[in-house]
Amino acid sequence: MNKIYDKVKECYKQVNEMTEFKPQIALVLGSGLGDYAEKIKIETVIDYQEIKGFPVSTVQGHKGRFVLGYVEDIPVMIMEGRVHYYEGYSMSDVVLPIRLMKMMGAEILFLTNASGGIHRGFEAGDFMMITDQIASFVPSPLIGPNIEEFGERFPDMSHIYDEELQEVIRKSADHLQIDLKEGTYIQLPGPNFESPAEIRMCKAIGADAVGMSTACEAIAANHMGMKICGISCIANPAAGISKKPLTHEEVQQSADRAAPKFQKLVTECICRMGKSLKK
């Protein structure tokens, strides 16, 4: 058997012993957005440290626990704090939580993050629906022997972000009168912020927002046949777009300010997605 698969399976076995909860939607919360989980009807909370072998987030603003419960009547599994490649974890560990949530029963993966705005039309506090991604600057989580239990060797990436879910997000934002941007997200390894020259490169190859997560998670989820959608909270203009130095504190503060609007948007999206799952 494959060691990576065995590790995910062992984590699944442990979580399954802690709860019988079966999520339909998996939600990953980015920097500063973690308080959303406090608003749902909570069924179970599992700290990552309770799961032997599970990677633990070390980043400020990432709590490091699963919250399982209901948004309205939709069963969701929320990651309050993701792990990042720059923390020193292998890419297989970075995407282990995604694979676990799929094993738990989640059909949809809803990714969120705080990112730097590359597009000149973006301002801090804007929301960008991710329509495509660039992940060429970080290792693919699919490198190594293919894990047949998860998916095929060469998965297609033409429509990573599900078009029906994108339409759900558009309608949700329109219903709430939230100005929704759209664009391509690029993941760079971090933990250092990007240089102005790197941002010029990102812009030249078609990126609208930049961050240090998300794209690798989408690759793993796509491999397993999950439906994927994503929203970036534009926390700050990327290097060279603004002349101010970038700090993680600024990212958190900006995400905190956007949180109330973000929470409404996510709730509306999940309710609409849940209805589509029942059809």
Features from the language model and the residues they span:
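Metabolite-binding pocket within alpha/beta catalytic cores that recognizes anionic/polar moieties
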Residues: 1-157
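Non-catalytic positions within long, well-ordered alpha-helices that form the structural scaffold/packing
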Residues: 102-105, 203, 222
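Short acidic/polar active-site loop segments enriched in Thr and Asp
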Residues: 107-108, 208, 227
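Histidine/lysine/aspartate-rich catalytic loop segments that bind and position anionic ligands
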Residues: 134, 138, 142-191
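Active-site/ligand-binding-proximal alpha/beta "capping" segment
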Residues: 166, 172-208, 266, 273-277
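Zn-dependent metallopeptidase/amidohydrolase metal-coordination segment
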Residues: 212-250
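His/Asp/Glu-rich mid-to-C-terminal helical/loop segments that flank catalytic regions of hydrolases
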Residues: 239-279
